């Protein structure tokens, strides 16, 4: 059991200090008397159940003095102090005029996360199998929402909207680890370490407008969910062009070879407010897995490492796509009128029109990668000892040897450094080496 009494000057004296506590409890089941027979037979070597619960706080609440109203002098369009007329002859008031520049919220407070975890650790059959399982859940509440991201009616009269603690979000999932180690009578050893993680979050409450459709609200979707215009192939003929829904912007510039953008809400007009819909997942994988497999025998050894992810969407927004430069190689092949094929809308002498991208740059980011493979032989006896060395190892390995994915390239991320430079593609390498130990 532990606790912390935390304070932050971002909040008013009434909300500045909060006590957060947590605790954990474990039970070594394998040490109980009723487990003795299983331990003696080396069926169960160790089995432990554990759980924890606790709260932590977050004071990332925008401006430092958000609980205090910020007043400013009234100025004209040129930035000069402006005093209001006070008589029929137009003479100005001798007093300085102020207005509420930022409306405060004195009730701003710590955002809180209630973290819960329950799991178990195990070892079976004389250490042949071992691993763990964990189920976790984080309930976040009083999440900070800035005034700029709040929903206010059109008749709201102030220049700014006060910040608020209102958001709620749930994050949950589980982790599985399995380890295998087996040595045969002839000294041959097999071993494996494998992990799998599932993690999902859902926004339970945000300051969404009450009367908008559910697909336009953040509530019910994951943090970081992609919203996009939905494209349904290309406009291939003039008949298809004339039958497409009108577009709020640049409707007169739509051409054959552009994407057919779906009028998601069916009102006859494609617009940014009503026709961008949830698409795919977030940029963080919901499912991740990895495994390392090894084998050893009489100086020979081999191992392979593989990993992958699913439940993820990648927005391939490379620097070469800036300003709609549709002629770059990275963008893919243009639509052509001969067979209607291609990946990119028909090229123009000017920049791309609005809405044309659709889901063009949103890809299923799932992948399976064979990360490393190594084969080696190690001498530890005989002639190597006579030469005064303890061991000599020859090895051949490779990195990034195999990849299965629907992504258009093999990059860990879109950008490689601050400033927006494109990330260098993942490199395949082969190495041969000698390791000599004295």
Segments predicted by a language model, with ranges:
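Surface-exposed extracellular loop regions of Gram-negative outer-membrane beta-barrel proteins
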Residues: 1-11, 16-31, 113-116, 124-131, ...
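Flexible, solvent-exposed coil segments and beta strand-coil junctions
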Residues: 2-7, 92-101, 147-161, 173, ...
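Flexible, surface-exposed loop regions and adjacent strand-edge segments
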Residues: 16-22, 66-73, 148-158, 207-217, ...
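Short loop/turn motifs that connect adjacent beta-strands in outer-membrane beta-barrel proteins
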Residues: 30-47, 125-128, 183-190, 203-208, ...
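Solvent-exposed loop/turn elements at secondary-structure boundaries
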Residues: 34-111, 128-169
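Conserved small-residue
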Residues: 64-66, 70-79, 181-283, 399, ...
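C-terminal beta-signal and terminal closure region of outer-membrane beta-barrel proteins
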Residues: 66, 159, 163-171, 214-241, ...
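Extracytoplasmic gating/loop element in the C-terminal half of outer-membrane beta-barrel translocons
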Residues: 254, 309-398
């Amino acid at each position: 059991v532990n606790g912390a009494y935390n304070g932050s000057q971002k909040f008013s004296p009434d909300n500045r200090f909060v006590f957060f506590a947590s605790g954990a409890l474990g039970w070594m089941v394998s040490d109980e008397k009723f487990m003795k027979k299983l331990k003696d037979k080396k069926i169960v070597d160790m089995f432990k159940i554990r759980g924890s619960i606790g709260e932590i706080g977050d004071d990332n609440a925008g401006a430092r003095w958000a609980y205090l109203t910020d007043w400013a002098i009234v100025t004209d369009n040129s930035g000069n102090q402006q005093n209001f007329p006070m008589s029929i002859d137009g003479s100005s008031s001798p007093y300085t005029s102020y207005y509420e520049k930022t409306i405060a919220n004195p009730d701003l407070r710590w955002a809180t996360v209630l973290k819960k975890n329950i799991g178990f650790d195990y070892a079976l059959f004389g250490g042949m199998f071992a691993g763990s399982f964990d189920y976790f859940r984080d309930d976040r509440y009083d999440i900070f929402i800035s005034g700029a991201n709040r929903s206010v009616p059109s008749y709201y009269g102030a220049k700014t909207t006060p910040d608020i603690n209102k958001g709620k979000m749930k994050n949950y999932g589980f982790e599985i680890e399995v380890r295998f180690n087996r040595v045969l009578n002839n000294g041959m050893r097999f071993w494996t370490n494998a992990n799998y993680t599932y993690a999902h979050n859902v926004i339970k409450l945000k300051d969404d407008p009450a009367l908008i459709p559910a697909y336009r609200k953040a509530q019910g979707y994951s943090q970081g969910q992609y919203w996009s215009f939905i494209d349904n192939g290309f406009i291939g003929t003039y008949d298809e062009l004339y039958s497409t829904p009108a577009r709020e912007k640049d409707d007169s510039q739509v051409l054959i070879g552009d994407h057919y953008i779906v009028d998601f809400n069916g009102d006859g007009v494609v617009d940014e407010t009503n026709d961008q819909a949830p698409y795919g997942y977030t940029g963080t994988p919901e499912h991740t897995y990895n495994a390392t497999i090894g084998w050893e025998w009489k100086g020979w050894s081999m191992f392979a490492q593989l990993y992958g992810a699913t439940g993820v969407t990648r927005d391939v927004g490379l620097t070469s796509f800036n300003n709609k430069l549709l002629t770059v190689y990275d963008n893919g092949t243009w639509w052509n009128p001969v067979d209607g094929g291609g990946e990119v809308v028909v090229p123009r002498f000017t920049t791309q029109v609005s809405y044309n991208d659709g889901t063009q740059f949103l890809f299923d980011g799932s992948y399976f990668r064979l990360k490393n493979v190594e084969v080696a032989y190690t001498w530890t006896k005989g002639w190597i000892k006579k030469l005064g060395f303890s061991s000599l190892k020859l090895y051949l390995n490779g990195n990034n040897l195999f990849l299965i994915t629907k992504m258009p390239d093999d990059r860990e991320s879109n950008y490689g450094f601050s400033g927006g430079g494109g990330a260098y593609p993942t490199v395949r390498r082969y190495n041969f080496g000698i390791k000599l130990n004295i």
